[in-house]
Amino acid sequence: NIAASIKKYYNRAMRLDFLIDGNNFDMAGEASSSVKRTLTKLGVAPPLVKRAAISMYEAEINAFIHGGGGSAHVEISDEKIEMVVEDSGDGIPDLDLAMQEGWSTASEQVRRMGFGAGMGLPNIKKNSDVLSIETEKGQGTKVTMIIYIREDKNT
């Protein structure tokens, strides 16, 4: 079980920290890939791994594209997966609008690369049990996502 795996190796909750380099497109998505690998190794149920990977990836790419990079911190315990992605970009001007599917402020260049479809925040909301977004114009954005681990579903 997950709790035994975490305690066996770490004797407490596991914490992963990442720097999201806003200047290195080749590294975009590395943090979410690492989280996915770690959760899989810990024996987290595949549907929960998928939800965490999607949420983490969307937040990471948003920090890369809109925030110029930032940081990600992930804490894995026997109760939950908590992921926090922060950037120091311009903030989200209209959070209610940004939560609507299809709304995007991505540049034309980003759209040509296949990003910026306006599904990032809606996908995070859909795949997280708890979503908190703190944003202020000119002050950046902090996205906190929680996925609860239900032991009875980890079979």
Enumerate the predicted regions with their spans.
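Conserved beta-strand-loop-beta-strand hairpin that lines the nucleotide-binding pocket
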Residues: 5-15, 60-155
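Bergerat-fold GHKL ATPase/HATPase_c domain
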Residues: 2-54
